[in-house]
């Protein structure tokens, strides 16, 4: 059963400080839009973040794509833009190893993701230890709230994240109520009758294109929000093919918000 509660109502009752903060930002900005910004230079990345910042609740990064990445040159300015425009940061790392390994990958190395990314995500393929390892890394790295999304479903053609795999990933999410805040999924993942209020973030959302020739399949905004998505993840629809990111940012923000208001009625 898809929830009809408002983001404000969900913020008030949610056990996760990070989810509370995200719901609050969404309500303040009247936005359930996450911008997925996959570009190869820091300058282009920061420019797009600054332009799209007013329209989004969340920016999604693949930080290892950036050729000239540096903590001081890329992350410090990104954090300043997050403060300026009031959005959160989601590093789409898709962790998929045993607990001890992901703990080090999350906290250490070149990217030090746990230091700056409010949200990250993980596959369920290695079992519940992945949640424990990532949570320990977050707690040992920062006093700021952090949240984890489990990858329950993907938007790519032929994805193996279906059926029993999806069900077991949901079971892994149930092992931690305050750190696991939700799923990357195409629909509502249930759990309401057991006291869970999971955020559903959905990639592969487009107002124009139906696919990209490389397996991505796009679905409409109204369809995914009506089906239980709380946050729509949009990438090339915002800035690809010569699009104006400010125009598209407002277009997708408005479409996403109106779809949410319809769901709440």
Swiss-Prot record:
Record carries keyword Lyase: yes
One BP term from GO: 'de novo' pyrimidine nucleobase biosynthetic process
Pfam families per the UniProt record, alphabetical: OMPdecase (PF00215)
Keyword set, alphabetical order: Decarboxylase, Lyase, Pyrimidine biosynthesis
Top enzyme category: lyase
Pathway: Pyrimidine metabolism; UMP biosynthesis via de novo pathway; UMP from orotate: step 2/2
Residue positions binding substrate: 38, 60-62, 92-101, 218, 236
Highest taxon above the source species: Eukaryota
Keyword Lyase: yes
SUPFAM superfamilies: Ribulose-phoshate binding barrel
GO molecular function, one term: orotidine-5'-phosphate decarboxylase activity
Active site: 94
Catalytic activity as recorded in UniProt: orotidine 5'-phosphate + H(+) = UMP + CO2
Gene3D superfamilies hit by this protein: Aldolase class I
CDD domains, per database record: OMP_decarboxylase_like
Similarity annotation: Belongs to the OMP decarboxylase family.
PANTHER family from the UniProt entry: OROTIDINE 5'-PHOSPHATE DECARBOXYLASE (PTHR32119:SF2)
Protein name as catalogued: Orotidine 5'-phosphate decarboxylase
Originating organism: Cyberlindnera fabianii
Gene: URA3
């Amino acid at each position: 059963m898809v929830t009809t509660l408002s983001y404000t109502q969900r913020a008030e009752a949610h056990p996760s400080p990070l989810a509370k903060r995200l719901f609050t930002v969404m309500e303040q900005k009247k936005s359930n839009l996450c911008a997925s910004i996959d570009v190869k230079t820091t300058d282009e990345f920061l420019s797009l973040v600054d332009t799209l910042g007013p329209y989004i609740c969340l920016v999604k990064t693949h930080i290892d794509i950036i050729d000239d990445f540096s903590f001081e040159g890329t992350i410090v300015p990104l954090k300043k833009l997050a403060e300026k425009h009031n959005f959160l940061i989601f590093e789409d790392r898709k962790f998929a190893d045993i607990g001890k390994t992901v703990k080090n990958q999350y906290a250490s190395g070149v990217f030090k993701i746990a230091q700056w990314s409010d949200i990250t995500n993980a596959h369920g393929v290695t079992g519940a230890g992945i949640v424990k390892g990532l949570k320990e890394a977050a707690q040992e790295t920062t006093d700021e709230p952090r949240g984890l999304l489990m990858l329950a479903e993907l938007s790519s053609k032929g994805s193996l994240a279906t059926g029993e795999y999806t069900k077991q990933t949901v079971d892994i999410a149930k092992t931690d109520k305050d750190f696991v805040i939700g799923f990357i999924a195409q629909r509502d993942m249930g759990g309401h009758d057991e006291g869970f209020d999971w955020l559903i973030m959905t990639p592969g959302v487009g107002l124009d294109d139906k696919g990209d020739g490389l397996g991505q399949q796009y679905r409409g905004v109204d369809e995914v929000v009506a089906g239980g998505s709380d946050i729509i993840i949009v990438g090339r629809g915002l800035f690809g093919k010569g699009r104006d990111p400010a125009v598209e940012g407002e277009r997708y923000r408005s479409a996403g918000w109106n779809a949410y208001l319809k769901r709440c009625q």
